Amino acid sequence: MSFIHDDFLLDTQQAKVLYHEYAKNMPIIDYHCHLPPEQVGQNKQFRNLYEVWLAGDHYKWRAMRSNGVDERYCTGNASDWEKFEKWCETVPYTLRNPLYHWTHLELRKPFGITDRLLDSRSAKRTWDECNELLATPEFSARGLMTQANVKLVCTTDDPIHDLAHHKTVAADKSFKTAMLPTWRPDRAMMVEDAESYNKYLDRLAITADININTFDDLIKALQIRHDYFHENGCRLSDHGLETVYAADYTDSEIKAIFLKIRAHKQLDAVEIEKFQSAMMVEFALQDHAKGWVQQFHIGAIRNNNPRLFRTLGPDTGFDSIGDHNYAKPLAKFLGRLDDQNKLAKTILYNLNPRDNEMIGTMIGNFQDGSAAGKIQFGSGWWFLDQMEGMTRQIEALSQLGLLSRFVGMLTDSRSFLSYSRHEYFRRILCGIFGRDMVKGLVPDDTHMVGKMIQDISFNNAKNYFPFVVPE
């Protein structure tokens, strides 16, 4: 039997039935990812397995560095084959890391490789077989999405993005997967460095075709772009936060703080926190007015290696889990919005697993009966996007909320091969329920439980998000 087989992770008969008869064939809504829109718009044909699988993958780079692989083979100038070969040499050392499971799931689907484990001995054969498939239309960017039964993806986009590739995809009626933008306005509140912030404001001003001299101008410029995103199908925002900002402030303070930084003067720590607190509220009010869903990814500390950040830049594998205490500011932020009846549907993702129960109870404070699961505890994110992390999130939500209303999995990935993460999640979910059924913790009723599995896999997301999912 191959390592990744039909019943992988399904250790009870009930789990096998739940997965094969209920979960496996459900379509995918990938409502948060980092796919490059231009690759979908241009229907990119990948030249080789490195380009589709390793390029830009900081998960793999971290593992390779930990295995003693020189940076030349991660982000450097080695050839594509050399980089792939070094990855294959590393794979056997990733046992018990989710990379080992992901790697072999991704070789199984879509490449159909189940007869080998990836290592230095199987590298060349795997390289040649996959590259041959990648030259075919079925393995283009869009072809891979179609193979994975992806109905809709939401990319992650800055307010200054022109969304040209989203328009291209929307206009092509032959492609049955929708690609929608997600509003990610983080840079509009990154006021720690006055010079870089002003450069961003200048670009935003050009894009919005408005002068940005005052705080009101900034909000108007963002509203112009928010409207533009809405016109092009955007129905979600996303915000990457080291912690939650909920300081007290007055309108006059924020206007004065903005004038100070627009004059290229550095803000102090108190001013930064007040401004970021105000921007979080402004973002949330714009989203509520449009009926969008807002997402908050909370708790990453980024670019922790100064030397390699200077050399390689962001998103290259030098981020980690933070340890901020943000329960009170989060409650204060959500309460500010709820007090005005302007709290949009919200998904909260924590990066530190110690916060699972805090988030699991926090969401219950702001459920108001207007929508099932209005406030969501998001799936295990980033470093928690693995078997233990996803299981702990599922367990916390089960005990403290309604798992039955959970909107389920997302890839959070830059790769077109990452849709196997939905399969991984579904297998884990079915395994949990199968064991519960055997133990008598839930009824041994596969139809009842199977419907819930299908809801978490697809139906809940389809019903929760305010976009139209293609049939």
From Swiss-Prot:
SUPFAM superfamilies: Metallo-dependent hydrolases. Keywords: Isomerase. It catalyses: D-glucuronate = D-fructuronate; aldehydo-D-galacturonate = keto-D-tagaturonate. GO terms for biological process: D-galacturonate catabolic process; D-glucuronate catabolic process. One of its GO terms (molecular function) is glucuronate isomerase activity. It comes from the Bacteria. It is an enzyme of class 5 (isomerase). Pathway: Carbohydrate metabolism; pentose and glucuronate interconversion. The keyword ATP-binding does not apply. Its EC number is 5.3.1.12. The keyword Isomerase applies. NCBIfam families: PRK02925.1 (NF002794). Belongs to the metallo-dependent hydrolases superfamily. Uronate isomerase family. HAMAP family: UxaC. This is Uronate isomerase. The gene is uxaC.
